[in-house]
Amino acid sequence: MEQRAVVRQRQIPPVTLGPMLGTARLRTGLRGRECARLAGIDHAYLIRLETGQRAPSRKVAEQLGAVIAFTAEERAELFAASLPDVGKDHPGKRAA
């Protein structure tokens, strides 16, 4: 069976997503490094999310949702902007 590479298109997140993430994180009382550690993501990646340079994957959105006290509206915005997971562990991704 032939496997085809799965390519994830880079998506520009909504302009409100980054500031909303930073505001919610601060409201929760978390510093950037602490939030990244608790969510299991790299601090530099969290910065890219908060500055609007990246849109989170669905998995990262779930991880952030577990550590940041989002309002219902913020959580909906986060998940609406998230991308399907096609990371290194995704079954559609070819082994290198």
Predicted features along the sequence, with ranges:
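A short, Lys/Arg-rich alpha-helix, primarily the initiator
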Residues: M1-T28, E62
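Short amphipathic recognition helices of helix-turn-helix/homeodomain-type DNA-binding modules
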Residues: E2-R8, R58-E62, A66-A96
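Helix-turn-helix DNA-binding elements, focusing on the entry/boundary residues of the two helices
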Residues: L21, G32, H43, R58-A61
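The alpha-helix within a helix-turn-helix
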Residues: R25, A36, G65
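Short alpha-helical DNA-recognition segment
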Residues: T28-R48
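Residues in the helix-turn-helix
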Residues: E34, Y45, A55, E74-E77
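Short secondary-structure boundary/hinge segments and terminal tails
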Residues: H43, R54, S82-L83
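Short, conserved catalytic or interaction motifs in soluble domains
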Residues: T51
